[in-house]
Design a protein with these regions (language model features):
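Membrane-interface "cap" regions at the ends of multi-pass membrane proteins
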Residues: 15-75, 87-88, 92, 104, ...
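Select transmembrane alpha-helical segments in multipass membrane proteins
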Residues: 41-52, 116-128, 161, 216-229, ...
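Transmembrane alpha-helical segments of multi-pass small-molecule transport proteins
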Residues: 47, 81-82, 123, 148-175, ...
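Hydrophobic transmembrane alpha-helices that form the core helical bundles
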Residues: 67-70, 89-170, 310-331, 371-386
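TM-loop-TM module centered on a large, flexible mid-protein loop between adjacent transmembrane helices
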Residues: 106-116, 258-319, 338-375, 379
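C-terminal membrane-solvent junction of multi-pass transporters and transport-like membrane proteins
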Residues: 341-352, 387-441, 467-476
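Membrane-interface loop-to-helix entry segments
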Residues: 142-145, 154-204, 216-217, 234, ...
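Helix-loop-helix junctions that connect adjacent transmembrane segments
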Residues: 35-40, 77, 150-153, 182-303
């Protein structure tokens, strides 16, 4: 069977691609914020690992494999493994950066330290729209709950889920991390059950590379499948946000990052093997994973899988996304790019105002039935612009922090490090070009205007006496 890779196929999966990519007031015056002594050095390597894996494994593992089979046939599993490698290429320098520096505000702190004040301002305001990614999870978790229990209203279930994890995150990062560990363990059990029972029922030649259906649409189809998958493969980079909270940041953060890569390759590859190996390809192509799950699991196990698979995958993503969105923004508030009062903390150290903002950004599109795919489309180029700022910052490490770089426990030669930076640049350029092919002219115009606004903001705001860049990057 040859699977069609026509324009219609690409159109069918466009919405899925957009959703997966981001599964993501007042006068600006100086104000006094009550200082809360932050708890530091309490996250273990296992905590960081589960935060990263839980963030990365979202709805993509359930929704993307069917469309990928349309694009590349039996090799959909291999494309997912390749996408995990591509996803690492996008952030390849980060393990080495985090072995050298502790970052208090994630990418914002890195860009501000390496690229300068004005670029930090551009990044600060450009990051805010990306908090819309929480809404994509709210929509998805409601959809899956409704498919399992039709009597449940998908919209209100999504809002309820966002509300529960908003409350958990208000209890502090330590509580969020404990909940995340439980969610990820249960998620592994559910996906492991699917993989093991599915592999026992394989019928298709999933490992015959020369089979006609293995690369059904040739190299272009295989590459398209990688691009479809790739945004579900590097969410674990959020671990870098927790430099202050990690017990041994220089050792634990880079290792936790690296541990996530083989984990995702095994989980994603295993699920995709089962998805393409049990039923005929023409039955599963373009279909969600639940179709296969119903065929290999009895009703009781299917219910367990639906709760432990898609629902918990999205729950772990929601749980970590709230804090991940707040930490960089909080640092930009402390530096004066945004109102400093926004960085207020409760007694548990949670940035409650920013979490409320993130929560509202998550529930309002769900509540008002906004087209999230349209919103995501309109900020796609802005997100790409921020990614290129990150890459510029990567290249500055050996010069900006030469002594700390030499002492890094993961030190490599400058040539090898710059090679990793070039890999990241190459990976992002390919994704940027691939994304631009699907963008319409109005979206491009809106995105370019947004980029210009961010640049202008960084330039003019940088001269304000209220902007005082705090130290949020430490060498020891």
């Amino acid at each position: 069977m040859a699977l069609n890779n026509s324009h219609d196929v690409r159109k069918r999966i466009k919405y899925t691609i957009n959703i997966t990519i981001y599964m993501q007031g007042g006068a600006f015056m100086s104000s006094t914020v009550k200082e809360i002594k932050e708890k530091t050095g309490y996250l273990k390597r296992s905590d960081l690992y589960t935060i990263g894996v839980g963030q990365a494994i979202g709805s993509g593992v359930l929704t993307l494999i069917g469309p990928a089979i349309l694009l590349t046939g039996q090799s959909a599993w291999l494309a997912y493994v390749a996408a995990c490698i591509w996803g690492f290429m996008m952030i390849a320098p980060i393990p080495w950066i985090t072995s050298t520096l502790k970052l208090g505000g994630g990418f914002y702190s890195l860009v501000g330290d390496m690229a300068g004040k004005r670029v930090a301002g551009m990044y600060a305001v450009g990051f805010l729209p990306q908090t819309i990614n929480l809404a994509t999870y709210g929509v998805a978790i409601g959809m899956y709950a409704n498919s399992l229990w039709p009597q449940i209203n998908a919209k209100w279930f999504g809002i309820a889920a966002l509300s529960v994890f908003f409350a958990i995150n208000l209890c502090g990062v330590d509580v969020m991390a404990k909940v995340q560990k439980i969610l990820v363990i249960l998620l592994f059990v559910a996906l492991g059950l699917f993989i093991v029972l599915g592999c026992l029922q394989l019928k298709n030649p999933v490992f015959e590379f020369t089979a006609p259906d293995f690369f059904s649409n040739g190299p272009s189809g295989f590459f398209s499948a990688i691009m479809l998958y790739v945004y579900s493969t590097n969410g674990y980079s959020c671990i870098m946000n927790y430099g202050k909270q990690a017990k041994e940041a220089h050792k634990d953060i880079p290792k936790a990052l690296l541990y996530c890569i083989p984990t995702l390759m095994v989980v994603y590859g295993g699920v995709a093997i089962v998805a393409s190996g049990v039923l005929p390809l023409d039955q599963v192509a373009g279909q969600p994973l639940t179709l296969v799950a119903k065929n290999i699991l009895n009703p009781a196990l299917f219910t367990v899988f639906m709760i432990g698979g898609p629902v918990l995958a999205l729950s772990s993503s929601i749980n970590s996304t709230i804090s991940n969105n707040c930490i960089p923004v909080a640092q930009s508030c402390k530096d004066g790019w945004l109102p400093k009062s926004w960085a207020a903390q409760n007694r548990r150290g949670a940035y409650w105002k920013l979490m409320t903002f993130t929560y509202l950004m998550g529930i309002l599109p769900v509540l008002l039935d906004f087209s999230i795919s349209d919103v995501v489309n309109n900020i796609m180029l802005l997100a790409s612009a921020l990614a290129f700022l990150q890459i510029y910052a990567y290249f500055q490490l050996p010069k900006k922090h030469a002594e700390a770089w030499e002492k890094s426990p993961m030190h490599i030669s400058n040539g090898k490090y710059y090679f990793l930076c070039c890999l990241s640049l190459f990976a992002y350029i390919c994704i940027f070009i691939n994304s631009c092919r699907s963008l319409k002219l109005p979206v491009v115009i809106i995105s370019l205007i947004a980029i210009v606004v961010c640049m202008a903001y960084g330039w003019f705001r940088s001269v304000s006496p209220d902007v005082k860049m705090e130290t949020s990057v430490w060498e020891d």
